[in-house]
Amino acid sequence: MNKTLTTLFALAVASVTAFSHAQEAKGDVEAGKQKIAMCIGCHGIPGYQASFPEVHRVPMISGQNAKYIAAALVAYQKGERKHPTMRGIATSLSEQDIADMAAYYEQHGKKGADLPAKPSREPSVQVAELLKKGACVSCHGDNFAKPIDPSYPKIAGQHSDYLFVALKAYKADARNPNLGRSNAIMGGISKQFTNAELKALANYIGSIDGDLQVVPQSRFR
């Protein structure tokens, strides 16, 4: 592992430790079920697309790690993730709301046999080199569905267009008040790649089997 990736891995461990200390609220699945009406309007509609900062399918969050969902919502609250709709929603939530909603979505994923330890399909030679360069498995796991810590996302099978938009957001200039995601780890990694390379990574990771899914739901229950 080169010096840059070694430094980023150290930052990853430090950030996980810091977040685990900060997160104290315990999530309640049943309470979360009563709080997700605002989420269903986008994340509960198969194929639903957002238009900011460009058109892409909204991420699948059913089956995602609760700690990651909570961390993402806190990042929107703080403005570390820049998205007008998500910031407006996140700032309306209490710490307990976030914990409850995250707990609900974590158990809402695909059911059945465990995923294999390795991805369901092999990458091309080009993509394999890109994955190695980014050391993606170091945090997201060998099959991209079992990250080293639950405050990191499962990305296997996630919508490829969403992954591409997210990766580009990490590359964005941190001084831009309207666009981007502030994350030292992912920022350092994503800036090593061209947008074409990021798209190739996103297309591969989005094509493999994962736990995530969209569960169609009505807001009127």
Model-derived features: positions:
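Bacterial N-terminal signal peptides that target proteins for export
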Residues: 1-8
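N-terminal signal peptide c-region/cleavage motif recognized by signal peptidases
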Residues: 15-19
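Residue-level hotspots at or immediately adjacent to binding/recognition sites across diverse folds
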Residues: 23, 45, 89, 142, ...
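Sequence/structural segment immediately N-terminal to covalent heme-attachment motifs in c-type
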Residues: 24-49, 119-144, 159, 217-221
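Gly/Gly-Pro-rich "capping" loops immediately C-terminal to redox-active cysteine motifs
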Residues: 29, 33, 47-76, 87-92, ...
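Inter-heme linker and motif-flanking segments adjacent to c-type heme-binding CXXCH motifs
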Residues: 46-53, 79-82, 107-125, 129, ...
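C-terminal capping alpha-helices of c-type cytochrome domains
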Residues: 91-114, 188-217
